[in-house]
């Protein structure tokens, strides 16, 4: 921890991460700024470490890198949290005491929502600094800052001027606790859950209506009965001049859509069982039957039954027919016996009652059978895609189901026989404040017109010009650009920016976080300016115009823009990341559109999903205190690629710590070999003559090359594999090969390895790298040192092949010794004769493994007199070598160079033969290129 504090202080004092325009090529990257309503956990750690590694890497490559940070405090969830804390809600207090570890004296101040975000903004910054993030903190801001609010008002006025903001009514996710619409960003549970529209069909019962919700209004012609749950509570409500009967649980949701809805009394559902209602379309009477499967919290708690086409209704009727106790209790024996399914949809391949057929097909036994859901899903899809209304249906007979559904629903609503409501596709949907969300139809609401076709075209053009990592999620962006409908962009309460033309409203969090990357470019320069003077002309002059005013601000913006990389989580593709594309494409010219996006996977903790609300998290501060920042960073970068889900496992984190300890120990080992600490600033390029020295430098070149290419595409796991794990394996092998040697070549090679390796690891473990860089005589900060060079045409291939041959030869000798069960006095190794290399060359030049073609060329060139031997060898080439690339090496020189090592590995004297001058058992004939023959004596 002392080392970490030391380097944080030095970085800060030197200001090395403060980025200002200069003559270098720039890199500008941002990651989603956090919503500081809780403590930072290890999932956040991965999110913010990826861009820091990339920023450090590009900085070392010589780029001018801007990596800023800010705090997204807009929204209502924090107000809900403050209210719950104010009223001493036990669950909320427990979470903030035990999970977020807020001291009691601080928690007492959490009844103020602004203090909550102030507290956690400080906490976040402190932890980010502890993690060693190379952030330009001069540009830090909160989304409630007056200057930022003026910027956001400029943005939304621009969009309104373009006709991309409208007013109207629209169903939205809504938190009654916060009294506000909510987006996915505001949710603890239910992110990405869609809002479905259902048709409400009114079945008359006396002076009231039982109102049943359905996705399939066209099946009203096949209704046979209604279902109620006799064990739940039902009520009478008044709305639109009518009296409806619905479940009590449905009131919470429906009252936010029918704003005049009032409860007028209780209804005992048991009293309704056996009574009949009137079908709003056919006028037929249908009995009300009991059903425990009816969920009172879904829609209205009233279901109409179509047993010919709904497998659940068919099987429910069958189950009821055999429940004699229930039938007797309500006197329903004759009623149920008389019910017959009514066909209303014709589908090729199915008979009169398709529901019965799919139940038999799937082997569904009763209502509890899990296969019922599969049967239902299959039939609904088939009838929607291929079904037509049966010919006996008035007016609509022969019409496609997919068309009839909408037409029938609209006509019934026009006649007052139906209505509509909205419901979540899945439940529960829980706000960050802990409140249960409903669907609310917002009147007098402001919307972003993402439905606008011309705007969608612009967004597609913007996306087409972007790099997307990983590329396979591009299809997700394309889908959401097409799928997005109008978006409620304002709220009644919460922290944030007032809508400039209607100050009753506050701009919601996703709308105010789409182009803030542009604000970063000038944020530090606006700090001392008067927000009141920042009108639209001010921001136009900076971001859009060529006028002479505010030239210094405009030049700073133009230096950094466009944004090179935007990084965020994959669950934000459907909103924030796609909104980011929409807004840039509308406001900025094409030259200012974003260039790339990187999408993150999610985080697991010991195999389970992380959740602050459920206490299943490890705070990042705790992980740093236990393991150190470098260990945390390295594990997060090496456990999975950024777009993959990662799993924090304590045992693997401990293993990561050991790798860093080994890295430090390597530095000390090199110091010992060099008879004192190396001076890295004085290291000159190694030029080894030995094959193993050339091999080590070739491997180092390869690891640098592959790590560099991986980092260019944000493949942090692959980069760590190359830069640490595989290079460590190479170094271990080299040290073993040169064991006992301390000559100048070994010293030079190891000094070069250490010099490159510290720089190679600096983006991942900056504290360790800085300490080692200083300890071993590096110049300045390693964070500013040049990234190690590599060459694409290095001689690494032939030395790699040479070393592989040495290792294979050692293994072959050891295998023979194991079979013989004894250690020989001498090991004779016979290299391949020149003619076999020539034949191999011919085979490669011929380009096809054809016996005749190869033999013809060999004969024509007179390579070898004994054509029988040639034929045997060619057959072996065809069998074993395939189309492998031919790399020619001097086997004799390589093996002679490695003879001491081979002797140490096999424990016997080694004799290398380039000719079979001593070959008592005629082994030399078995030698082929890269696979010497062996004789033990």
Curated annotation (Swiss-Prot):
InterPro entries: aa-tRNA-synth_I_CS, aa-tRNA-synth_Ia, Leu-tRNA-lgase_arc, Leu-tRNA-synth_Ia_arc/euk, M/V/L/I-tRNA-synth_anticd-bd, Rossmann-like_a/b/a_fold, tRNAsynth_Ia_anticodon-bd, Val/Leu/Ile-tRNA-synth_edit
Keyword Nucleotide-binding belongs to the record: yes
Gene Ontology MF terms in the entry: aminoacyl-tRNA deacylase activity; ATP binding; leucine-tRNA ligase activity
This enzyme's EC code(s): 6.1.1.4
Subcellular location: Cytoplasm
Gene3D superfamilies in alphabetical order: Class I aminoacyl-tRNA synthetases (RS), HUPs, Isoleucyl-tRNA Synthetase, Domain 1, leucyl-tRNA synthetase, Valyl/Leucyl/Isoleucyl-tRNA synthetase, editing domain
Residue interval(s) of motif 'HIGH' region: 34-44
Primary localization: cytoplasm
GO biological process: leucyl-tRNA aminoacylation
Highest taxon of the lineage: Archaea
Placement of sequence motif 'KMSKS' region: 609-613
Keywords: Aminoacyl-tRNA synthetase, ATP-binding, Cytoplasm, Ligase, Nucleotide-binding, Protein biosynthesis
GO cellular component, one term: cytoplasm
Keyword Protein biosynthesis: yes
Reactions mediated catalytically: tRNA(Leu) + L-leucine + ATP = L-leucyl-tRNA(Leu) + AMP + diphosphate
HAMAP family (alphabetical): Leu_tRNA_synth_A
Protein family membership: Belongs to the class-I aminoacyl-tRNA synthetase family.
Protein name from the UniProt record: Leucine--tRNA ligase
Organism: Methanothermobacter thermautotrophicus (strain ATCC 29096 / DSM 1053 / JCM 10044 / NBRC 100330 / Delta H) (Methanobacterium thermoautotrophicum)
Gene expressing this chain: leuS
């Amino acid at each position: 921890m002392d080392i970490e504090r030391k380097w944080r202080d030095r970085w800060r004092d030197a200001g090395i991460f403060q980025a200002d325009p200069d003559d270098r090529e720039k890199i500008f990257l941002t990651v989603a700024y956090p919503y500081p309503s809780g403590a930072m956990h290890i999932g956040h750690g991965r999110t913010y470490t990826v861009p820091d590694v990339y920023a450090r890497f590009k900085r070392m490559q010589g780029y001018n890198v801007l990596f800023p940070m800010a705090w997204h405090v807009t929204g209502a969830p924090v107000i809900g949290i403050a209210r719950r804390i104010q009223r001493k809600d036990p669950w909320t207090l427990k979470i903030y005491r035990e999970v977020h570890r807020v001291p009691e004296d601080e928690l007492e101040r959490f009844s103020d929502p602004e203090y909550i975000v102030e507290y956690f903004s400080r906490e976040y910054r402190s932890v980010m600094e502890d993690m060693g993030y190379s952030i330009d903190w001069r540009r830090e801001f909160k989304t409630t800052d007056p200057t930022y609010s003026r910027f956001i008002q400029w943005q939304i006025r621009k969009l309104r001027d373009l006709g991309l903001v409208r007013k109207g009514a629209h169903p939205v996710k809504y938190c009654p606790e916060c009294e506000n619409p909510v987006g996915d960003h505001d949710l603890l549970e239910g992110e990405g859950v869609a809002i479905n529209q259902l048709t409400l069909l009114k079945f008359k019962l006396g002076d009231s209506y039982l109102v049943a919700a359905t996705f399939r209004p066209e099946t009203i012609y096949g209704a046979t009965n209604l279902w109620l749950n006799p064990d739940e509570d039902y009520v009478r409500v008044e709305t639109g001049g009518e009296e409806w009967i619905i479940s009590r649980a449905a009131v919470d949701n429906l009252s936010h859509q029918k704003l005049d809805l009032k409860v007028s009394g209780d209804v005992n559902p048991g009293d309704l069982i056996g009574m009949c209602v009137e079908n709003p379309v056919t006028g037929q009477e249908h009995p009300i039957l009991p059903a425990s499967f009816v969920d009172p919290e879904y829609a209205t708690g009233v279901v109409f039954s179509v047993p010919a086409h709904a497998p659940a209704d068919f099987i429910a009727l069958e189950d009821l027919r055999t429940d004699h106790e229930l039938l007797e209790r309500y006197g329903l024996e004759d009623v149920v016996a008389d019910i017959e399914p009514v066909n209303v949809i014709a589908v090729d391949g199915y008979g009169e009652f398709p529901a019965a057929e799919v139940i038999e097909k799937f082997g569904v036994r009763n209502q509890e059978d899990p296969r019922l859901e599969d049967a239902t899903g299959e039939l609904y899809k088939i009838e929607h895609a291929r079904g037509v209304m049966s010919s006996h249906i008035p007016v609509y007979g022969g019409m496609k189901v997919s068309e009839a559904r909408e037409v029938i629903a609209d006509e019934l609503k026009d006649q007052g026989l139906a209505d509509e409501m909205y419901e979540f596709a899945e439940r529960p949907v829980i706000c960050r404040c802990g409140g249960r969300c409903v669907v609310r139809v917002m009147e007098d609401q402001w919307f972003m017109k993402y439905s606008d076709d011309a705007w969608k075209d612009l967004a597609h053009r913007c996306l087409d010009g972007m790099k997307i990592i990983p590329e396979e999620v591009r299809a997700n962006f394309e889908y959401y650009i097409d799928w997005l409908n109008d978006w409620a962009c304002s709220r009644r309460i919460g922290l944030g920016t007032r809508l400039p033309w209607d100050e009753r409203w506050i701009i919601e969090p996703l709308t105010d976080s789409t182009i803030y990357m542009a604000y970063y470019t000038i944020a530090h320069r606006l700090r001392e300016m008067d927000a009141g003077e920042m009108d639209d002309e001010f921001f136009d002059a900076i971001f859009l115009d060529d006028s002479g005013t505010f030239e210094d601000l405009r030049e700073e913006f133009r230096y950094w823009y466009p944004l090179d990389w935007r990084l965020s989580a994959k669950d934000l593709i459907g909103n924030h990341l796609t909104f980011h594309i929409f807004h840039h494409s509308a406001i900025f010219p094409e030259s200012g559109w974003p260039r790339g996006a990187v999408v993150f996977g999610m985080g697991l903790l010991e195999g389970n999903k992380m959740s602050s609300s459920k206490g299943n998290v490890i705070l990042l501060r705790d992980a740093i205190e236990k393991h150190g920042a470098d260990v945390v960073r390295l594990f997060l970068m090496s456990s999975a690629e950024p777009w993959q889900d990662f799993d924090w496992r304590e045992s693997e984190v401990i293993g990561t710590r050991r790798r860093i300890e080994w890295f430090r120990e390597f530095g000390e080992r090199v110091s010992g070999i060099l008879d004192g600490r190396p001076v890295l600033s004085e290291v000159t390029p190694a030029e080894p003559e030995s094959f193993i020295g050339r091999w080590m430098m070739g491997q180092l070149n390869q690891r640098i090359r592959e790590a560099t290419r991986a980092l260019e595409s944000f493949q942090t796991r692959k980069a760590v594999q190359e830069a640490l794990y595989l290079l460590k394996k190479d170094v271990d092998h080299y040290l073993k090969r040169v064991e006992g040697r301390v000559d100048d070549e070994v010293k030079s090679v190891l000094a070069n390895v250490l010099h490159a390796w510290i720089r190679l690891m600096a983006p991942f473990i900056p504290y360790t790298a800085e300490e080692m860089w200083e300890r071993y005589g590096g110049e300045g900060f390693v964070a500013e040192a040049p990234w190690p060079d590599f060459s694409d045409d290095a001689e690494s291939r032939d030395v790699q092949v040479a070393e592989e041959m040495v290792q294979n030869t050692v293994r072959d000798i050891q295998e023979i010794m194991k079979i013989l069960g004894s250690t020989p006095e001498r090991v004779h190794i016979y290299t391949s004769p020149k003619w076999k290399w020539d034949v191999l060359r011919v085979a490669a030049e011929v380009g096809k493994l054809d016996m005749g073609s190869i033999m013809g060329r060999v004969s024509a060139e007179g390579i070898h007199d004994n054509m029988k031997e040639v034929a045997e060898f060619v057959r072996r080439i065809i069998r074993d070598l395939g189309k492998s690339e031919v790399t020619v090496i001097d086997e004799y020189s390589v093996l002679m160079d490695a003879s001491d090592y081979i002797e140490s590995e096999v424990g016997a004297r080694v004799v290398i033969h380039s000719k079979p001058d001593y070959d008592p058992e005629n082994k030399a004939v078995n030698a082929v290129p890269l696979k010497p023959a062996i004789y033990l004596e």
